[in-house]
Each structure stands twice: as structure tokens, then as C-alpha cells.
């Protein structure tokens, strides 16, 4: 089979990264930025809300163990796709819900997945997740990579990241590492 990569943004990348790293079959997760117009943005640039970029993660996974839909299922479980430009305490377009497909097949699969969630009334509100083709992914600085692993006792991590990691372990127990 091989590996594939999914690029997703659902609020602060520290949260999404830590949640995705729990999933068996995920071989690498990189925090970064995508979806905007500014070339090679810094964290400070993206946090200003003026770059058009969202905080995202690139999730590399083994297709013998996971399907794209499995990654999407975890993604939609650990963030609220019904709020515009917000996830928990983080507010701004850089925290929007976005799926950035790498090709037409991923675009079709992401659209079908969101349509199924909407048809099932899986959430209390309408899903506002953007689905836009990935143009360029910019990795974040090293200090943002594996942030939860490096800083599990930081206040933001204990309040925001840890509950998402716990949720993945509880809901996807057999599929976590």
C-alpha cells in the first residue's frame, strides 16, 4: 500500500497534532501553516490573522492501517466544525476548520465525508469546515513540533490539549498506539 498525507486544521495545531499522534498507523505529524497567501510565514505572522493561513497539521499515515476517512473521523471528533474561526478559547481565521486535500480523490472523499456527517446531523449546528486544495504547506518552527509531548504540564496543554488526547484514547481505544 504505502503512505499518504492528510492536511487538516481544526484550531490550535498543538491540539490536532497531539490527537493525531495517538492513532495507530500514523507515522508522522508536522505542525505548520497553509491556506493563505503569505510565503513562509512565522508563528507571529499567522497569529496576527493577516496571512490568510490556518494552523494545520500534516498527518502521514500507513494506508495498510488507516484510510483517509479514519483520519477525518478523528479530526472531526477532536474539534468543533460548526464554529467559524474559533476552536475553544482560540479565536481568529487562523483557527478555522479546514481540510486541505492533496489531490482530487482526497477532495471527493473529504466532501463525501462532510456530506455524510451533515446528513446524519452529527453536530448541533451546520458544518462550516472549508475544503480547499492544498497549495503550499509551511512547517512551523521546531519549538511547535511535538509541543504536547514536550510540554504536557503547560497550562494550555492541561486545559486544552490533554482532553482531546483523552477523547481519542476513549473513543478510538483499539485504534490507538
UniProtKB/Swiss-Prot annotation:
One function term, GO molecular function aspect: peptide-methionine (S)-S-oxide reductase activity
Keyword Oxidoreductase among record annotations: yes
GO BP field: protein modification process
Catalytic activity: L-methionyl-[protein] + [thioredoxin]-disulfide + H2O = L-methionyl-(S)-S-oxide-[protein] + [thioredoxin]-dithiol; [thioredoxin]-disulfide + L-methionine + H2O = L-methionine (S)-S-oxide + [thioredoxin]-dithiol
Enzyme class: oxidoreductase
Keyword set, alphabetical order: Oxidoreductase
Catalytic machinery residues: 12
EC numbers: 1.8.4.11
Domain of life assignment: Archaea
A Pfam cross-reference name: PMSR
Family recorded in the similarity comment: Belongs to the MsrA Met sulfoxide reductase family.
NCBIfam families named in the record: msrA (TIGR00401)
Entry function: Has an important function as a repair enzyme for proteins that have been inactivated by oxidation. Catalyzes the reversible oxidation-reduction of methionine sulfoxide in proteins to methionine.
PANTHER family referenced in this protein's UniProt entry, alphabetically: PEPTIDE METHIONINE SULFOXIDE REDUCTASE, PEPTIDE METHIONINE SULFOXIDE REDUCTASE MSRA 2
Protein name listed in UniProt: Peptide methionine sulfoxide reductase MsrA
Organism name: Halobacterium salinarum (strain ATCC 700922 / JCM 11081 / NRC-1)
Classification of source organism: Archaea, Methanobacteriati, Methanobacteriota, Stenosarchaea group, Halobacteria
